């Protein structure tokens, strides 16, 4: 466990390490501090929230509880500008996408790793991502 923590500290950097280690030491406290946005979507919430995302081109991944979409832009600069906007919002939300970029394409997967599945945070970030993409 100590070796894993040392590797994680090196991976996340010194600035984020304190928060990460504090959460590791007291998992109950960090779970208690989570907002209602950080809980799995209920069946009713899925029925209400996911169809709108699917209509916008998002798909549910069958191999894990996550949503995915690929965006295409005019060029790399536009794709990178989009990623920068999303990154700033994700940092504000403390909720970070899995993404991959090659030239003008950006592939995004959203899931809440701390909950092990889709949450309202994922839906809110996906909705922001849609607005950011539409504004370019």
From Swiss-Prot:
Keywords attached to this entry: Acetylation, Lyase, Tetrahydrobiopterin biosynthesis
Gene Ontology process terms (BP): tetrahydrobiopterin biosynthetic process
Ranges that cross the membrane: none
CDD domains hit by this protein: PCD_DCoH_subfamily_b (cd00914)
Keyword Acetylation carried by entry: yes
Enzyme class, first EC level, given as a word: lyase
SUPFAM superfamilies: PCD-like
Residues with N6-acetyllysine modification: 120, 124, 131
EC numbers: 4.2.1.96
Reactions the enzyme catalyzes: (4aS,6R)-4a-hydroxy-L-erythro-5,6,7,8-tetrahydrobiopterin = (6R)-L-erythro-6,7-dihydrobiopterin + H2O
UniProt modified residues of type N6-succinyllysine: 120, 124, 131
GO annotations of cellular component type: mitochondrion; nucleus
GO molecular function, one term: phenylalanine 4-monooxygenase activity
Assigned protein family: Belongs to the pterin-4-alpha-carbinolamine dehydratase family.
Subunit structure: Homotetramer. Interacts with DYRK1B.
HAMAP family, sorted: Pterin_4_alpha
Protein name: Pterin-4-alpha-carbinolamine dehydratase 2
Organism: Mus musculus (Mouse)
Gene encoding the protein: Pcbd2
